[in-house]
Every structure is written in C-alpha cells, then in structure tokens.
Amino acid sequence: MAATIDDEVHALAQRLWDFHTAPAAHSPPTPGEHDIILALGSHDLRVAEHAAHLWDAGAAPLIVLSGQRGRRTAGAHGHDRWPRPEAEEFAQTARATAGIPSTAMLLETHATNTAENFTHSRALTAAHGIAVTRAIVTAKPYMGQRALATATAHWPEARWTFHCFAGGYTDYPNADTPTEELVHFLVGDTQRLDVYARRRWSSPVDIPDDVWRAYELLVARGFTNHLVDNDTTSHPRPTGRSVP
C-alpha cells in the first residue's frame, strides 16, 4: 500500500513526534557542567550546527562527532552516497558554524549504528584519557528516546542529557527530508525502541498505548520504509514496554 499524507497521518505522526522528543531539555545547559557533547552522525547537518552552538555557549569543552555512514548516507533509497564519513562532514559544519578548533573535537569515524556511536565514542574518549561523568547527546529531535535508551545501555556510568535543535513536527521537514520521509523515520524509531530493547541493544522504554496504536495505524497506512526485521522471538518483551 502506497503511503499518502493526509490529516489523519499528520495527527498520528504528531503523537509519535511528541513522544520521541519528550526527553529533550528545553533550557540551555549550564556552562562547564558537562564533559563532552556527543553528536550522533546522520544525514541532518543541523545536528552538527546545534552541537557547535552548544560548544560555543560553553556547555562542554569537547565535541565528539560520531559516525561512518548509515543507510541514508550510504546511498539507500536512491539518496546520494556521502563521499566522507558523517563525522567528517559534521566536523566541517561545526567549524563553519562556530569556528571550533580541531583541539576541541574528536572524530569517531567507524560507527554505523546508534549503539556503536556510544561504544566507539566511549572507547575513544577513554583512549584520550578523558573522564566522562556528565554528557550531552545531540541528534535529530525525534531520536530523543532512542538516544537516551542507547546511552544508558552502552555508556551507563555517564549521566546523559538530550539536547536538539529547535522546531516541531511541522518545522522539521525540508528539501532533504520531506514530510513523508519524516513519518517513515518516526515509525521506524518507534519500532526500534521495542525491538532493540528485546535484543538488549538498548534499555527498555515505556511506550504508551496511544503511541503504539499510532505506530500500528501508520504501518497499516504504508509507512514502512524505515522498519527493521522484527524477528525477536528468542527475546522476552522488555518490562519497560507498555503492551496495548
């Protein structure tokens, strides 16, 4: 079934957006309160711009930019393959945004998924002798729930805060990510919270019944491009999952 956008889809997608962005901090971080800013690589360079603004405001002395290429930046679904790893593209954007010196950035160029963003960055900071007890993670706004769930599973000794660039569901789409693709991403990230927790790739997150119902209705409407294999029969449903 071809996915089409209408008022029902907008309402359902708005519910997913509100859920996924709920963990985002709305007040500016206190200068000097965090050890690092971890920017999760993706196709959205606004994340790198926001990380640069956080650094420029004194949120942390160091930015860790993490990412090789994901499905989108590797050329999936007809998109152009990025010539360089996401971390390198992010670094270029961060420099252009706030003039960040190379000494204030660490580039992690091997991660191909969110779990690896954290495990590889954790190893990289440790190799540089950097103790991380409080940290900011920034990513696409709708990755708030998944970013923190992954952080607590793979870098649990640090206390994490999620920050993202401003704007809501209707503000996020642009020429690079139209509304239809955003809805596919929202559906996929909702599924990942459930599936990845069962696979023990991330910590369990309580998904309210109305959020899960919105997800199911959007899947039925054809928004399935960002779904992953759901063969998790050998894994128990996480206790944090609210079953409809």
Residue positions per predicted region:
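A structural signal for short, hydrophobic/glycine-enriched beta-strand patches
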Residues: 1-186, 241-244
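A conserved mid-domain beta-alpha-beta active-site/ligand-binding segment of alpha/beta enzyme cores
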Residues: 175-232
